[in-house]
Curated annotation (Swiss-Prot):
Lineage summary: Bacteria, Pseudomonadati, Pseudomonadota, Gammaproteobacteria, Enterobacterales
Regions annotated as coiled coil: none
Superkingdom, natural source: Bacteria
Family: Belongs to the Smg family.
Record PANTHER family: PROTEIN SMG
Protein name: Protein Smg
Naturally occurring in which organism (per UniProt): Pectobacterium carotovorum subsp. carotovorum (strain PC1)
Length: 157
């Protein structure tokens, strides 16, 4: 599923390609690209839920307003997000790439992934996808993109 998300993001979303394709056509295109239909449906569902969060169609998050508050991760979250990932999220909050709401959106979307293996590079891509889909986060998206891509050669770090 994560491979499908990456492919969609790189091929359509990130390149600002016109994505007014119906789901059946997109599914057929992805199947021809070699992806499993179940992974395709899971990825499309993941993106729909991200859009629902972004549009406020899900229940609002109740977050502490205290800037000194520390996020306590659940056991499942610590299994998916290792210390390096959690440290990176904290770093992004400290440099104001993420705020409380976008951090929670990222964690929610990470936990919704159907994958056993997840590392820092995967987290960076999820963060980029979330920031891309949240209005008003253009500067944060640009900062995150700079952290993700090497400016000189364009390769993913």
């Amino acid at each position: 599923m994560f491979d499908v998300l990456m492919y969609l993001f790189e091929s359509y979303i990130h390149n600002e390609t016109e994505m007014r394709v119906d789901q059946d056509t997109l599914t057929d295109d992805l199947t021809r690209a070699g992806f499993d239909r179940n992974d395709i449906y899971s990825a499309l569902s993941w993106l729909e839920k991200l859009a629902d969060i972004q549009e406020g169609q899900t229940a609002p998050l109740y977050l502490a307003n205290d800037p000194l508050a520390m996020r306590i991760y659940t056991q499942d979250e610590t299994l998916r997000l290792d210390a390096e990932c959690r440290g990176f999220l904290l770093f992004l909050e400290q440099i104001q790439v993420l705020n409380l709401e976008t951090r929670e959106m990222v964690i929610e979307r990470v936990m919704a992934l159907e994958t056993q293996e997840f590392d820092l590079e995967d987290l960076k891509w999820v963060i980029l996808m979330v920031l891309f889909n949240v209005p008003g986060c253009e500067n944060a998206y640009q900062q995150m993109e700079e952290l993700l891509f090497e400016v000189n050669d364009g390769y993913v770090q």
